């Protein structure tokens, strides 16, 4: 499970770094401490990873409603001191219920995340067999 979370962190960092390369550093943006959140809303489980000022991860059952699960994730993050509506937090969502994450800065398909994660882990171009 630890390897899974490491992969999610790599994918999240890679996506955000590419999207904001000219405007932000992954460590700080304009002198602020930043938090980066990767959310994978699957059909049965939702996985969340936080990296930056806070370093956390957790898993919740998705249940019948991805929208309700997103609210639970948002509330749990707030309990941990991570405000997803803050300019100091950037969020990437993927998975079956990714569209329900209305507070995400970026929404990416699972296939794209797998490809970017595989490339990051392999250190360059590679083949992925699913």
Label each PLM-derived region with a short phrase.
Residues 36-40, 90-92, 126-130:
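Short glycine-aspartate micro-motif
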Residues 72-83:
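A short, N-terminal amphipathic alpha-helix
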Residues 36-72:
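Short glycine-rich, Thr/Ser-proximal phosphate-binding strand/loop in the N-terminal lobe
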Residues 59-62, 81-112, 120-121:
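Short beta-strand-loop/turn "lid" adjacent to the catalytic site in phosphate-handling enzymes
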Residues 11-33:
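Short, Lys/Arg-enriched N-terminal segments with co-localized hydrophobic residues
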Residues 5-7:
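Acidic/polar hotspots within intrinsically disordered regions
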Residues 52, 119-123:
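Alpha-helix C-terminal capping segments
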Residues 34, 44-46, 87-88, 122-126:
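Short coil/turn connectors at secondary-structure junctions
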């Amino acid at each position: 499970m630890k390897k899974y979370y490491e992969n999610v962190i790599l994918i999240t960092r890679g996506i955000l770094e590419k999207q904001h390369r000219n405007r932000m550093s992954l460590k700080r943006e304009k002198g602020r401490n930043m938090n980066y959140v990767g959310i994978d809303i699957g059909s049965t489980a939702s996985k969340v990873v936080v990296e930056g000022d806070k370093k956390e991860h957790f898993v919740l059952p998705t249940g019948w409603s991805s929208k309700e699960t997103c609210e639970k994730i948002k509330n749990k993050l707030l309990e941990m001191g991570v405000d997803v509506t803050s300019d100091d937090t950037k969020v990437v969502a993927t998975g079956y219920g990714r569209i329900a994450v209305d507070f995400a800065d970026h929404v990416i398909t699972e296939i794209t995340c797998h490809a970017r994660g595989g490339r990051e882990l392999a250190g360059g171009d590679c083949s992925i067999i699913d």
